[in-house]
Amino acid sequence: MVTNELSEKIKIYILRILNKQFMYPDEIIENCMEEFGAQINTPNPSLTIKNQLKILSDDKMVAYYHGYKITPKGRKEI
């Protein structure tokens, strides 16, 4: 199970790595798995990270243009 605290850490981590560079979804998932893999206690951790990306996208903090990049709204969060 992923707690709200861990979800927030994943969210901030995604925003920070996207602030550095444009990334494809698989790269984001791979980086998050390296960083948080042992802490995500779900049957499908990569789906958990994909869901977090979707939430960020729905909140207009990241945008998808053949890959993800951070938006000005997302930059304000970090």
PLM regions: where:
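Short alpha-helical segments that sit at the start of domains
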Residues: 1-26, 45
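General structural signal for alpha-helix termini and helix-helix connectors
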Residues: 16, 20, 34-38, 62
